[in-house]
Amino acid sequence: MKKLFISVPMKGRTDEAIRNSMEKMHKIAELTFGEELEVLETYIPPEAPDGANPAIWCLGRSIQKLAEADYFIGIGYTDYFHGCRSELSIARDYGIPCTYVDPYECEFLRDAVEIAAGRKEERKNIPTEVVLL
């Protein structure tokens, strides 16, 4: 059976929301690719070693899993989902057949969109001027 890599936003989301998104995306991928697919375990708990950047550490682990994939499903608009953007780029660059969903149109991804929108608002409050002393 061919293997499917599922890329979903994880930062700030509950385990339940992540698993629910993955389950729905699995079904979408099977319909899209026209065959039953084995899902690679891509949910990686953030257990980075001390001193490591947890987001980059998790991304590195997920890229190792991506090397085993025959197919890829992710999200289409990745502006605020940096790990998802990197995974999609790698899958495309290395010839893995890809499909994706629009996170703004999928109810099961609404929480991820809201979290990303909150991060966008936080960034607006970061001073952009540099003061030289």
Which residues are covered by each model-predicted region?
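Conserved catalytic or regulatory cores that recognize and/or transform ribose-phosphate-containing ligands
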Residues: 1-133
